[in-house]
Structure formats: C-alpha cells, structure tokens
C-alpha cells in the first residue's frame, strides 16, 4: 500500500481486465476483492490503443461490480512494452552511480535504446556488488512513456488514480516473495506466462532475474485464443 492507504491492482490485457485488492494482517495477506471482465473481439495489444473507450467502460463496470472503494491503483504494463536487461558494470559507489545516472552517460554507454532517453521511463536497481572482481550487476528496465500513457489514461478515465506502475513479470515476482515457503531456499524459481499477447520465462536466482521471450507460432497463438479447445490443453 501507499502510505498505509488501500491500493487496488489493475491488470489490463487485450482480452481481459482484472482487479485485485489485498488486506494485510501481521505480515499475512488475504485476497479480499477480485473482479474481472473479458473483452470481446480483442485481437492483440493494439486493441488497447485503438479501442481504449471499450477498456475504460469495462474497467468502470468492474470497479462498480467489484465494490472497489479505493481510488488508488497499482497498474501493470506488459513485458512486451519494456526493455529489461541485467548489465555488468565496473564497481561504483552509490554516489558515483547516481551521478552517472543523472547525467545520462551511463545508459548511453551501456544500453542501446532505439529512441531518445527522454522518451522512456527508466528504473534501475543494483542487484549485487562483487568487490573481489571490482564488478557490479545492475537491473535496467525501460518503458516507452507513450506505451505507459495508454494504460494510465484508461485507468484515470475510469476514475482511478495510478500511484504505482510495474512491469507485469516483476509484479508477479514481488507477489511471489510473499510465499516464504518458495523464497527461503536458494533454488532457482521460474515464472512462465503463455498467452495471445505475452509469452516469456522469468528465472529468479539469488535476486538476479533472467528473462527471455518464448516464440509461439501463429498456429499456437490461434490455439491459445480458441475457446473450444479441449480443456485438458488449458
């Protein structure tokens, strides 16, 4: 939550909108509200951009039907709208790293972006420092501001106030950290998502993420979107 205020999670995909709200007590979380609606005739992620009014209307309906009272929202954006890299850098102090970030020289030297830096929202985090080898690993996540705005405009027009934005795979990772039985060991954890628009694997090991797209043929995509397939295949 943000400053102890309630926050509702909003997940918008081409074919479905989901809302979820948790309640916490003594470090334990309970799913208190869950609501969703399917979007008819949504083909791919471009539907969200080209038919935004439909998504606004559906989201407004879900808020009402799900009896969501808070207006604060945590919004997920798709992996396909983000550039995610773990970059290896010479060891720097926090002050040196912040100075390099503030001058944009760090990203210009280590990350090749297709557009100007000011067209991206950038998040970074030091994953680990290796003083013996004088190296450090840094997580770099960049999302186009235009892509983010498409989602935030839908959320705002439906009456919510987006206070948190996160890439979907990392939102899932953060939720997974609440599962102490899974995160207490050093064994790698894999998160796999298959769908019409998002297909990737995220492997977590020692707090370092590795993410890779999974290629699906057009035939496989049609199979995933076919509501009449054998339930065993779901």
For each feature predicted by the language model, list its residue ranges:
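Hydrophobic/aromatic-enriched cytosolic interaction surfaces used to assemble or bind macromolecules
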Residues: 1-234
